[in-house]
Amino acid sequence: PDFDYAAASEADRLQRLAAWVGHIDLIEISDGALDDEAREALAVFRRMAKLQAEVGDEVFGTYVISMTHSASHVMEVLLLARLVGLCGHNGRDWFCRIQVAPLFETVDDLQRSEAILDQLLSNKVYRALVAANGNHQEVMLGYSDSCKDGGILASNWNLYQAQLSIIAL
């Protein structure tokens, strides 16, 4: 309640999100406290959790995070997953029943992709969730937006550079 998320720095956002995602007890969120967009996003995650409970973990594939501009964008998705019990810490072990993949689409995002992934993988909570999900991190690199953004040559070069740096991680 006393944390101004919109005004916070990226480092502070990431730290706070990690604390919320890593909290042992589920955080209760009243739908009445949310705006329409947040309520709709949480409803999607509730549906995902319900489907997993009814059908099994394999009911849906990777959750792609379009236009990932920062590490906090990925952790925000994991917070939604945590709110419905798809990931977190149960007091003994970490669990993660959702695979998330950042999608880097613009030239700027492609250039920042290594730093963003390094931030995520250096975060203890995120790293624990990746480990609980089989130590597998999927990453997507977009072509069309980076091409619109910087042209064909810049797009291809930045895609190539992003691939090299991500593989090195």
Feature annotation, model-predicted:
Residues 25-36, 56-67, 95-106, 142-154:
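Glycine- and acidic
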Residues 36-44, 65-76, 112-113, 158-159:
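Phosphate/oxyanion-binding active-site loops and adjacent basic polyanion-contact surfaces
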Residues 46, 53-61, 72-98:
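Secondary-structure-rich domain cores
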Residues 34, 47-50, 59, 159, ...:
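Ligand/cofactor-recognition surfaces for anionic moieties
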Residues 1-54:
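Extended, charge-enriched "interface" segments that sit outside catalytic cores
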Residues 76-89, 101, 105-169:
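Active-site capping/gating regions of soluble enzymes
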